[in-house]
Swiss-Prot record:
Cofactor: Mg(2+)
Binding annotation for GTP: 12-18, 40-42, 304, 330-332, 412-414
Gene Ontology biological-process entries: 'de novo' AMP biosynthetic process; IMP metabolic process
Function: Plays an important role in the de novo pathway of purine nucleotide biosynthesis. Catalyzes the first committed step in the biosynthesis of AMP from IMP.
Organism: Microcystis aeruginosa (strain NIES-843 / IAM M-2473)
Protein known as: Adenylosuccinate synthetase
Keyword S-adenosyl-L-methionine in annotation: no
EC id: 6.3.4.4
Keywords: Cytoplasm, GTP-binding, Ligase, Magnesium, Metal-binding, Nucleotide-binding, Purine biosynthesis
Residues given in the record as IMP binding sites: D13, E14, G15, K16, N38, A39, G40, H41, T128, R142, Q223, T238, R302
Lineage: Bacteria, Bacillati, Cyanobacteriota, Cyanophyceae, Oscillatoriophycideae
Membrane-spanning ranges: none
Family annotation (SUPFAM superfamilies): P-loop containing nucleoside triphosphate hydrolases
Family to which this protein belongs: Belongs to the adenylosuccinate synthetase family.
């Protein structure tokens, strides 16, 4: 039995969907614990591409129970579209369960999200405009609509009438936007409620019962560590906690039941939207990474910013999440490069900085200090074992594992399930030992 968390170790878009899909083969339950339709997972199976935003990647396995947890925010219109798309591909959603305490994204959330971002002007943060932030804000303000409210039709009308009138004042007076028609919104969401009702459960209890039965549970993260509301590169972050601790809170389970935490990172770095990005590239190499890596967002279609692997933020992700091992994705994207760089530290105001600054202003002033390594300049997408990889690719991976101080358990060399090398058992492998008092090579400045 193992309870495993899969976490993004960068700014999201690391390939968690594929890794979760791979691990779902041995999972009895897959749980999505936070975020909403601002996240996108792409899974390719036998030539078919599945793009999911809310539904856990484990849905492709009919015997795997998939739970959308209480820490998520659910847009029913998007969720129903995803379910319909899966049905069209002969994928059942009978194994999908929705937490009754998850919050619901409403039309006014989307409008407020987009209007607020536009009003920020040059201070915009790069929101997806899907209403995620305003939904979480209502949750904190304790005026949100939860799934349990959605399916309680008697109380839903009363709650929504008050809330829509309240939001209409903001839309009209602050943003000069037309008001929403409360009756239209209420009728729309009552229809959603009837369709989703059979899937609604007490998710915390359902997960707890699975733990008691010693089932294998996989907790699927959305976004990435550097987008965490508390521990990310604030204010250019999401509105939830996509770290290992957030998976426990958003699922309603205690941290002591977690056996392993797996971090997913690209062999380079990408970021969507605004915010500092020390290793960001421009020119020919950046274009190559974007083209070969198909770096366009699943949710928004926005072009991702591309740069070299940043071991400073990687080490930060190891620390914040307590990572036990890594899955490195898109190694094949680097196949044609003559040389590859890894950021091992920053130069900040004339001083060497080996840890992530908390200040966005300081982070924006960080200049990368690189270690340059030779490229392998041969294709790796057909490699299926470490022995198949070019020596330079192996050296690169060994360096990443050494500087991050966690073993690399999975190497992904393409979007398909079979384009993968399993180095060690990512689920039942050993727990990562804490460092001894002599510190690490990183602390001793050996890199």
């Amino acid at each position: 039995m193992a309870n495993v968390i899969v976490i993004g170790a960068q700014w999201g878009d690391e390939g968690k969907g594929k890794i979760t899909d791979l691990l779902s083969r041995s999972a009895d339950v897959v749980v999505r614990s936070q975020g909403g339709v601002n996240a996108g997972h792409t899974v390719v199976v036998e030539g078919q591409t599945f793009k999911l935003h809310l539904i856990p990647s484990g849905i492709l396995y009919p015997d795997t129970e998939c739970i959308i947890g209480s820490g998520t925010v659910i847009d029913p219109s998007v969720l129903l579209k995803e379910m319909a798309q899966l049905h069209a591909l002969n994928v059942t959603t009978d194994n999908l369960y929705i937490s009754q305490t998850a919050h619901v994204t409403m039309p006014y959330h989307r409008l407020l999200d987009q209007a607020s971002e536009e009003k920020r002007g040059k201070y915009k943060i790069g929101t997806t405009g899907r209403g995620i932030g305003p939904t979480y804000a209502d949750k904190s303000e304790r005026i949100g609509i939860r799934v349990i409210d959605l399916i309680n039709t008697e109380n839903l009308r009363q709650k929504l009438e008050w809330t829509i009138n309240y939001k209409n004042v903001i839309l009209e007076k602050l943003y000069n936007l037309p008001p929403l028609d409360a009756k239209t919104v209420i009728e729309e969401y009552l229809e959603y409620a009837e369709i989703l009702r059979p899937h609604v459960v007490d998710s915390s209890l359902k997960i707890y019962e699975a733990i008691r039965k010693r089932k294998n549970i996989l907790f699927e993260g959305a976004q990435g560590t550097l987008l965490d509301l508390d521990h990310g590169t604030y204010p250019y972050v999401t509105s939830s906690n996509p770290i290992a601790g957030g998976a426990c809170v958003g699922s309603g389970i205690g941290p002591t039941v977690i056996d392993r935490v797996i971090g997913v990172a690209k062999a380079y770095t990408t970021r969507v939207g605004e915010g500092p990005f020390p290793t960001e590239l421009e020119g020919e190499i950046e274009q190559l990474l974007c083209d070969r890596g198909a770096e366009f967002g699943t949710t928004t279609g926005r072009r991702r910013r591309c740069g070299w692997f940043d071991a400073v933020i990687g080490r930060y992700a190891v620390r914040i999440n307590g990572l036990d091992c890594l899955a490195i994705t898109k190694l094949d994207v680097l196949d044609t490069l003559e040389e590859i760089k890894v950021c091992v530290a920053y130069q900040l105001d004339g001083q060497t900085c080996r840890h992530l600054p908390s200040s966005a202003g300081e982070f924006a002033r960080c200049q990368p200090i690189y270690r340059t390594m030779p490229g392998w300049q041969q294709p790796t997408s057909d490699c299926r074992s470490l022995e198949d990889l070019p020596k330079q690719a192996l050296d690169y991976l060994k360096f990443l594992g050494a500087i991050m101080e966690v073993p690399i358990a999975i190497i992904s060399l393409g979007a398909s399930r079979d384009q993968t090398i399993i180095v060690e058992d990512p689920i039942h492998g050993p727990k990562r030992a804490l460092l001894d008092e002599n510190g690490s090579p990183w602390d001793n400045h050996e890199f």
